[in-house]
């Protein structure tokens, strides 16, 4: 029995190993298909996000041009503010506080930090929304926009170099600005008064084709031997196993010493136990004595008429009948006299 169990276990193990080996390529193929599908979807999502970003840049540029500004550093031809002569006041980075086209000249204009190469945030035409330095419209006083202008997403791979564009039209000459107030003594700050501001980077180009895999690197040094592990804590005691089979009978022990005499005590009867399972059917017993005759049952229904029976045997001869009276005279001869004591059958009693 144990040999058969060993063969069966080996066979099952071999079959299991073959099944595992045959299923590994299928699992790898499924994982590869999922990876390719995920890569395709990520590529499509990246292209859509780039297109949306380009559309947003286009809308911001159109709105900026509608406000009367030809570039990041240009000036509009809007109405002059009340705080100076015709035209807007100076608003260069790091310079004195000024007013831009369309501003009413109020004193609550935000102070622009002195950052070299970044255009200031200007307000558009009257009633419009302010324009951020990157050209995108920002939330105005009446708008409910809480956009975060900072882009925390990691930059993608650089796209291919585009074809050079055509030269744009010349901008409108700006109005000379008003001299600013004298500043306090501080470190000299380089300001761009001539030329254009440094334009922000354009939208990210589409991703390039995947490059060839690089050369295989050098084999690393052999790692250090790990520290020997510590013995684990003793496990929890296992559950109680099933009752084992009874063991072999032991050798008969020596005769013990006689026990002490005690009084015989009769204990109280114990509680009635549960009835046991019914036993097996016994052998068939011997035939018993004939019982008493039972009460006669009710008469049954009358049966159908039977067939005609055979003729019975002839009956026994009957006894002789009584003597009859004498008959009438025949009138052809006289009747002889008869003896009254003679029998008729013996032809006696008549006298010749």
From Swiss-Prot:
- Name of the encoding gene: dpy-17
Region described as Furin-like endopeptidase recognition region: spans on this chain: 61-64
Main localization of the protein?
Answer: secreted
Superkingdom classification of source: Eukaryota
> Which family does the UniProt entry place this protein in?
Belongs to the cuticular collagen family.
Where in the numbering of this chain does the Collagen-like domain appear? 202-259
Organism in which the protein naturally occurs: Caenorhabditis elegans
Its name, as the record gives it, is Cuticle collagen dpy-17
Lineage at the top is: Eukaryota, Metazoa, Ecdysozoa, Nematoda, Chromadorea
Q: Tell me which positions the record assigns to the signal sequence.
A: 1-29
Pfam families of this UniProt entry?
A: Col_cuticle_N, Collagen
The residue ranges flagged as biased composition, category Polar residues, are 337-352
């Amino acid at each position: 029995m144990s040999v058969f169990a060993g063969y069966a276990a080996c066979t099952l193990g071999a079959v299991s190993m073959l099944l595992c080996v045959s299923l590994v390529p299928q699992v790898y193929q499924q994982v590869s298909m999922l990876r390719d599908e995920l890569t395709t979807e990520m590529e499509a999502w990246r292209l859509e996000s780039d297109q949306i970003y380009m559309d947003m840049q286009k809308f911001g540029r159109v709105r900026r041009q509608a406000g009367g500004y030809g570039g990041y550093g240009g000036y509009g031809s809007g109405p002059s503010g009340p705080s100076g002569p015709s035209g807007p006041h100076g608003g260069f980075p790091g310079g004195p506080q000024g007013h831009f086209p369309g501003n009413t000249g109020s004193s609550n204009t935000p102070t622009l930090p002195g950052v070299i190469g970044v255009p200031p945030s200007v307000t558009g035409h009257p009633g419009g929304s302010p324009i951020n330095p990157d050209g995108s419209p920002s939330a105005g006083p009446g708008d409910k926009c809480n956009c975060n202008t900072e882009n925390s997403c990691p930059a993608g791979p650089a796209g291919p170099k585009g074809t050079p564009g055509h030269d744009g039209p010349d901008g409108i000459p700006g109005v000379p600005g008003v001299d600013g107030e004298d500043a306090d003594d501080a470190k000299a700050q380089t300001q761009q008064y001539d030329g254009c501001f440094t334009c922000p980077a354009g939208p990210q180009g589409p991703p390039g084709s995947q490059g060839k895999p690089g050369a295989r690197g050098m084999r690393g040094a052999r790692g250090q031997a790990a520290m020997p592990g510590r013995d684990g804590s003793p496990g929890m005691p296992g559950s109680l196993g099933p009752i084992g089979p009874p063991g072999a009978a032991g050798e008969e022990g020596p005769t013990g010493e006689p026990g002490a005499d005690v009084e015989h005590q009769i204990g109280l009867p114990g509680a009635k136990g549960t009835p046991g399972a019914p036993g097996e059917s016994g052998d068939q017993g011997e035939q018993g004595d004939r019982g008493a005759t039972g009460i006669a049952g009710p008469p049954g229904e009358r049966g159908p008429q039977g067939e005609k029976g055979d003729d019975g045997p002839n009956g026994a001869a009957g006894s002789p009948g009584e003597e009859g009276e004498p008959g009438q005279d025949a009138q052809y001869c006289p009747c002889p006299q008869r003896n009254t004591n003679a029998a008729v059958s013996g032809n006696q009693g008549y006298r010749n």
